[in-house]
């Protein structure tokens, strides 16, 4: 009980919103059934001709359904659950404010229900228009209670709206610019803005009504120089905003349902290679252009092993260093790009080098705006700065935003292929028991890269932890179910380095264990020997 009362976790609050909305929906449905029973046939039916009671039911039904069912469920429930997940945030921007936003609603609902039972009830209709809501028509405290209820629910909505706006603007993943936000997040964001603009207007309108009823003012009383139309003007502005919010929300959910019900997933390619293709076709008009999938892989591979070098003499160079055992990967890059050269340095090291200024300009167009890690982006910016000084090419305008890779592109495959991230597939058969453990590991240096690593780990259902080496972080994917996601990814995205062989051995062991072959002592010993060959 204490957990639910004091929790500031967005998912806990979202669950509370949904439970509250279901409870309010049952109350609202009861009112709705009463209305329909009364209207089912001409004449008096179940309310014994009590027209005030009918008006009270109509009013309470509207308030409960709009302010305590639809808005808490759609914005508070689904918003708290999905918005932080979709933008890569750990929680809402103001978790304690989130708690307050929810716990203002139960007393608000209690006040509304109380208004239906005080005196003859608030039979004003959900618009609460004067003079029907004035002191002459409803002399008891029912309308006052309904107004207090609207005040509390309005405060709740405004606090929640501020929380959502701040969260979306300030807590997105690195590289997730506004145009890359999912449509659902946009729907919540615009909804929050509309609510924040409209609810203070409604608050002012009902506060003036409250003072008209209790403090002898005459904002809406023509006898004292007031204007009843003023309330309609203020209220219609509020309802216009809220109606617009409903339209945005419904159309967004409709778009989501179309995508999810067709059984297909539409994913926008986050990498933009238009500038690269433009310059490549100018320089090599009769050459086959590299495929998009290769370029995604190449960017990931470069983030692992590539270097943008400015020598002490001011010479510029792009270099990828690999073990000579993987020299075929460098030749593959040379063949696909159509420029650069591969050289051997000693017996163990090989390099792919680009020094020609025309080709460097093409590569700059490739990497500009498509880099994932901040550390690599910093070295790239220095490189471009020197390039702009030395070359006769048009000045390259640096794109400072980072790109977030997805599960459907080849970036992660290229990054795994690289030597320095030390991505590896591991399997352990524990002792003489039938226990086993599958893991996928990937390391990266630099505190500034940690947040990006977390977003990458989320793609593969992994976690990020500090490595034993200082300032190095490790993505770890554990568990047989999560391995299926890894297998699905690398089945659809080809590895080119010696890690391709490691992956095949690892996959064979996985299939053998999945088929139960490890239960046999002889097969288990064979699989143990095979595990030692995975990363050799």
Swiss-Prot record:
Ranges for region COX1 intron 5 encoded: 237-536
Modification after translation (UniProt): The mature protein may arise from proteolytic cleavage of an in-frame translation of COX1 exons 1 to 5 plus intron 5, containing the aI5 open reading frame.
Protein EC: 3.1.-.-
Transmembrane regions listed in the UniProt entry: 15-35, 56-76, 99-119, 145-165, 183-203, 234-254
Mitochondrion keyword on record: yes
InterPro entries membership: Cyt_c_oxase-like_su1_dom (IPR023616), Cyt_c_oxase-like_su1_sf (IPR036927), Cyt_C_Oxase_1 (IPR000883), Homing_endonucl (IPR027434), LAGLIDADG_dom (IPR004860)
GO molecular function, one term: heme binding
Keyword Iron: no
Pfam families: COX1 (PF00115), LAGLIDADG_1 (PF00961)
UniProt membrane topology term: Multi-pass membrane protein
Any one Gene Ontology cellular component term annotated for this protein: respiratory chain complex IV
Domain of life: Eukaryota
Sequence segments annotated as region (COX1 exons 1 to 5 encoded): 1-235
Name this protein carries in UniProt: Probable intron-encoded endonuclease aI5
Biological source species: Mycosarcoma maydis
Primary gene name: aI5
């Amino acid at each position: 009980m204490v957990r639910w009362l004091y929790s500031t976790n967005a998912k806990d609050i979202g669950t509370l919103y949904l439970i509250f909305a279901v409870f309010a929906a049952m109350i609202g449905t009861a009112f709705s059934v009463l209305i329909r029973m009364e209207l089912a046939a001409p004449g008096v039916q179940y309310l014994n001709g009590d027209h005030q009671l009918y008006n009270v039911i109509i009013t309470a039904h509207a308030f409960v359904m709009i302010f305590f069912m639809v808005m808490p469920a759609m914005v508070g429930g689904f918003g708290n659950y999905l918005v932080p997940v979709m933008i890569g945030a750990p929680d809402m921007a103001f978790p304690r404010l989130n708690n307050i936003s929810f716990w203002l609603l139960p007393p608000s609902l209690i006040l509304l229900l109380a208004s239906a039972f005080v005196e003859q009830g608030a039979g004003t209709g959900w618009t609460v228009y004067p003079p029907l809501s004035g002191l002459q028509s409803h002399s008891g405290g029912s309308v006052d209670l309904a107004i207090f209820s609207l005040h509390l629910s309005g405060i709740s909505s405004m606090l929640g709206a501020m929380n959502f706006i701040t969260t979306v603007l300030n807590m997105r993943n690195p590289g997730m610019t506004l145009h890359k936000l999912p449509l659902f997040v946009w729907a919540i964001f615009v909804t929050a803005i509309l609510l924040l603009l409209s609810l203070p207007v409604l608050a002012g309108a009902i506060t003036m009504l409250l003072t008209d009823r209790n403090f002898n003012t005459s904002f809406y009383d023509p006898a004292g120089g007031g204007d009843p139309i003023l309330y309609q003007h203020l209220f219609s502005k509020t309802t216009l905003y809220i109606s617009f919010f409903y339209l945005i929300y419904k159309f967004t959910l409709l778009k989501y349902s179309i995508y999810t019900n067709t059984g297909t997933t539409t994913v926008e390619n986050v990498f933009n290679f238009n500038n690269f293709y433009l310059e490549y076709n100018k320089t090599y008009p009769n050459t086959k252009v590299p495929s998009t999938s290769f370029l995604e892989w190449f960017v990931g591979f470069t983030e692992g092993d590539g270097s943008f070098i400015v020598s002490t003499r001011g010479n510029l160079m792009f270099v990828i260093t690999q073990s000579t055992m993987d020299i075929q990967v460098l030749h593959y890059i040379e063949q696909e790009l159509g420029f650069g050269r591969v050289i051997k340095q000693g017996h163990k090291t090989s390099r792919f080098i680009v020094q020609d200024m025309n080709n460097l300009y093409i590569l700059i167009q490739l990497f500009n705006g498509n880099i994932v890690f901040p550390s690599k982006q910093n070295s790239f910016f220095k490189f471009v700065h020197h390039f702009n000084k030395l070359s006769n090419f048009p000045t390259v305008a640096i794109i400072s935003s980072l790109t977030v890779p997805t599960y459907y592109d080849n970036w992660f495959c290229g990054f795994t292929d690289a030597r320095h991230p030390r991505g590896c597939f591991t399997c352990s058969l524990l002792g003489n028991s039938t226990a086993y453990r599958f893991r996928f590991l990937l390391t990266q240096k630099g505190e500034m890269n940690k947040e990006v690593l977390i977003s990458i780990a989320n793609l593969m259902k992994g976690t990020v932890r500090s490595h034993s080496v200082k300032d190095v972080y490790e993505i770890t994917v554990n568990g047989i179910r999560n391995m299926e996601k890894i297998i699905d990814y690398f089945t659809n995205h080809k590895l080119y380095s010696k890690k391709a062989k490691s992956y095949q051995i690892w996959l064979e062991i996985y299939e053998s264990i999945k088929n139960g072959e490890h239960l046999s002592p002889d097969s288990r010993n064979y699989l143990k020997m095979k595990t030692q060959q995975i990363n050799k």
